[in-house]
Every structure is written in C-alpha cells, then in structure tokens.
Amino acid sequence: MNVDGPFTASCPVVLASGSPRRQEFLRAMGVPFSVDTAGASEPEPVEGEAAVAYARRAACAKTLPVARRHAAACVIGADTVVALDGVIMGKPAGHAHALSMLRALAGARHEVVSACCICLPGNAQEPVVLHAVTSVWMHRWDDAALKAYIATGEPADKAGAYGIQGIGAFLVSRIDGSWSNVVGLPLTELLTELQRRGVVVPSGAQTAEQDGHAPDVRD
C-alpha cells in the first residue's frame, strides 16, 4: 500500500499484527507495509514474570514465525501489557471480569508496557527488541460509569479492559510517557530504531537513485 506521511521505507515492511490501531499508526507515518500474523495464540505469562520481560517475550513470539516467511523484509511485531502493582492484567474474560479489572484500576496508577520485535531483512535469528513504559492514572469512577463503559463492548479485546484511544479516554485522568505506547505501539522508539537501521527514511530525503547510494539496512 502506498500512503503519504513523514516517512517511507527502503525495504519491504511486514507488520506481524492484526491490530487496527498499530496498522493506523504505521499508515499515518507513511510507511508502506503488508500484514501477516503468526496465527498462534499469545504465550501466557509465567508466574512472577515481570511485565517488561513478558511483553518482550510475547512480541518475539508473534514476530519470529512471520519473519521466517519473509526473509527479504523487515518484520515488526508488538505486544502490549497492563500491569497494576507489578501484576500483569490480561484481557477480560467477560463483563464481570472487566468490571473487576476496572475497579482495581480506578483511582490508581498502573503501567502500560508495549514491546516491539524487529527482524531485519535476512536476519530473523537476531531480532532487535525494544520497549517503552507509560504510567497511567485512572479516575475513580463509580460502578455505574464503569458498567456503562463495559456495555459499549469496547473493553472486550483490550489489555486492562479499556482503550485510551476510544471511548475509554474518559477513564484516564493523567499519563506520564508515550500516549501511542498506551494505545499499543511505542511509536517514537520504533521509528527512531527503524531510521537508525536504515529501514525508514524521511519522505523528503534524497532517493538512492538521486544520491548514488543504496539503502543501508544495518543489522
């Protein structure tokens, strides 16, 4: 797909995620990409596993199988984890579970960790893994407001049972760190790394044909 934005890619890019939100971010940045997902279920956290360690492991589990199918591409996968007091909160199993999760988050500070796994062309065995952590404070809403939010259906597929980019924005009173990270992709960190590796370049930069140099996709 060809889209307009501040960046373009010097090699094929494959997003190993079916998340519409992650796709929207790359699309808005102008990075052409295709989508291919691993198809397997996400790994479960190990008892006592830290949120950062789990997010990084899960991101790689989603990315590596796809990278093996696209050796000539840069393959990017991601995972987002919500943790309260160091305990990982997954996606709600139903309305009652969502209410329990939102009650726990209401009036408290929690962390959102998004990790990215990047497999450079021809180098799927040595992925680059990065992550970002954002602190989020949720307003102490009463059960009536929480139940009304759950009734919208939005929490069903969201880590922590809320989506800051949608209706769930009203739940959050403050964040410290990257907003895109809470949505599901640490965009600044990801683009910085991709530009450093030569995978993406600013759209206004000279093309390889103009300056006589081939793109440098560094491992």
Curated annotation (Swiss-Prot):
**Cell compartments where the protein resides:** Cytoplasm
Q: Broadest EC class?
A: hydrolase
Q: Which residues form a coiled coil?
A: none
Q: According to its UniProt record, which reaction does this protein catalyse? A: dTTP + H2O = dTMP + diphosphate + H(+); UTP + H2O = UMP + diphosphate + H(+)
Q: What is its EC number?
A: 3.6.1.9
By its UniProt entry, which Pfam families does this protein fall under? Maf
Domain of life where this protein originates: Bacteria
Q: Where is the active site?
A: 79
| HAMAP family assigned | Maf
Q: What is this protein called?
A: dTTP/UTP pyrophosphatase
Query: What species is given as this protein's source?
Result: Oleidesulfovibrio alaskensis (strain ATCC BAA-1058 / DSM 17464 / G20) (Desulfovibrio alaskensis)
